[in-house]
Amino acid sequence: VASLTAPQAERGEVVVDIDATLITAHSEKEDAAPTYKRGFGFHPLLAYLDHGPGGTGEALAGINRRGNANAGTAADHLAILDLIENQLTPAQREALVIRTDTAACSHAFLDELTTRELGYSVGFYARADVAAAIEALPATAWVPAVDAEEKVRDGAWVAELSHLLHLDSWPPGMRVIARKERPHPGAQLRLTDIDGHRITCFATNHPGPDLPALELRHRRRARVEDRIRAAKDTGLRNLPYKDAASNQVWIELVLLAQDLTAWTQTLALHGEHAVAEPKRLRLLLFGVAARLIRTGRRIILDLDKSWPHAPAIVQAITTLRAYPAPG
């Protein structure tokens, strides 16, 4: 639903973000284990459609994993890739672009994406050879990066490193693009900073020459954090059952609730309600006082007329009724 009106649809892309999150378990449960942050619980892997700043994004897939699951396990990423493709039409699969962080930057995963002829934008480790390539780049190779509004961003540049790296063992067509940026005032410096600049890299198989646009597309993967935060506000903050199968069902129910919310916001709501997160929606719309009146073979929803957001509910119902019946 949302992918048809997403900003990326105009460019012929269906961008899907894959990311993992930690869920704390406060008691012994099946598959609960110590996490890399010295907690205890689970480490599920989730996938969301990116719908841009003006939309909510649909949940496409989620698999629960042990708390000590390796973030870079290719088998897990391949499993969720199958689930993602099962959610999409053939035309959408042809336009699919997988976007994720360095945890997915494995030969096995990128090889499979290439075999399936899918696009990707994946975080790439800034290793020693990458640092050497960056230092070897002439100043003229760097072009200004752009911000979220696609305007030139001061103090940030992007450049391609592919011709300076040995990428023979990686899939054909893979490019490595680097971004350097002066750290913000007060930011903690890192040992991996080069010449006083914060360096991030990503790999992509997109052939386009517009490096700032490709870098901006990759940086927008941060929006998946909003989806995961919304998932935890929808019920993913805790997996309540002792057995793993029931907890996987719980994850599916949470993702279904997110889909229903996303479809409602995409199809029926407007303004602030169309982009509000679950907590805000519960306050403004879901918790409004109302009663059902049955009279004359009709069912009437009588809303609290004093509630300032009641007109948004009426408008949403009117909008939904105006859509043609499916089929």
Question: How would you label these PLM feature ranges?
Answer:
Residues 1-50:
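Active-site-proximal, Lys/Arg-enriched surface segment
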Residues 211-265:
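Short amphipathic alpha-helical "interface-anchor" segments enriched in bulky aromatics
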Residues 37-46, 115-130:
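Acidic, His- and aromatic-enriched active-site or binding-groove loops in soluble protein domains
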Residues 26-31, 58-64, 74, 107-113, ...:
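Short acidic, glycine/serine/threonine-rich loops at helix termini
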Residues 35-91:
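Electropositive, glycine- and tryptophan-enriched low-complexity nucleic-acid-binding patches
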Residues 121-232, 315-327:
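An anionic, glycine-rich sequence signature occurring as long contiguous blocks
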Residues 261-327:
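A short, flexible helix-boundary coil/loop motif
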Residues 12-22, 57, 96-105, 120-121, ...:
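Short, conserved catalytic/metal-binding motifs centered on acidic residues
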